[in-house]
């Protein structure tokens, strides 16, 4: 999928893109085998419980994974794009946690801020793939909200680093 979208291996590595296998418990079992406590696994939002089942399951399955970083570049959550066309939610994010509130974060903010020159404005685009494609084309100053709307908190982040941010969203209703 990533090659079909024109992303080079170097770009994929730079953005630390990954894949969540189509398994209900691969991540849960891997983390447990590494000694991570069940409570920690659940607190980070990567493993969930269903309303009607007691057994936990991996939140992301059969998805391209996009690490979401805080303002300092530390991974605090993930976004995932479904590989199957039959999945209702094409994109989904980690649930809100103690560290992550999707309305307060912009994808690629730390990198974009570091790339800003004196004359550059920060560019806000619609999604992960837009940000990554722009970076590969030489525009490292792009960010994206983590949903269908740009929140007030996200706008404040933009204005902190760029007095005239450029908004470049798709023309569709999504």
Model-derived features with residue positions:
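Short acidic/histidine-centered micro-motifs embedded in hydrophobic/aromatic stretches
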Residues: 1, 18, 44
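Non-catalytic interaction/clamp surfaces of large macromolecular machines
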Residues: 1-13
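Terminal amphipathic helices with adjacent charged low-complexity linkers/tails
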Residues: 12-23
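Phosphate-handling DNA/RNA-contact segment within nucleic-acid enzymes
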Residues: 23-165
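Phosphate/diphosphate-binding loops
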Residues: 165, 170-174
């Amino acid at each position: 999928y990533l090659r079909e979208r024109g992303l080079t291996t170097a770009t994929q590595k730079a953005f630390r893109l990954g894949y969540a296998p189509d398994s209900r418990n691969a991540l849960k079992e891997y983390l447990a085998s590494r000694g991570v406590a069940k409570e920690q696994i659940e607190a980070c939002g990567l493993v969930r419980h269903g309303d009607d089942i007691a057994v936990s399951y991996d939140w992301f399955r059969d998805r391209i994974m996009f690490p979401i970083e805080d303002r300092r570049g530390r991974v605090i959550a993930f976004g995932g794009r479904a590989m199957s066309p039959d999945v209702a939610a094409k994109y989904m994010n980690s649930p809100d946690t103690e560290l992550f509130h999707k309305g307060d974060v912009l994808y690629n903010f730390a990198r974009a801020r570091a790339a800003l020159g004196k004359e550059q404005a920060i560019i806000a685009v619609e999604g992960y793939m837009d940000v990554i494609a722009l970076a590969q084309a030489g525009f490292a100053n792009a960010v994206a909200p983590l949903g269908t709307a740009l929140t007030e908190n996200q706008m404040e982040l933009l204005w902190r680093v760029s007095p005239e941010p450029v908004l470049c969203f798709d023309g569709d209703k999504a």
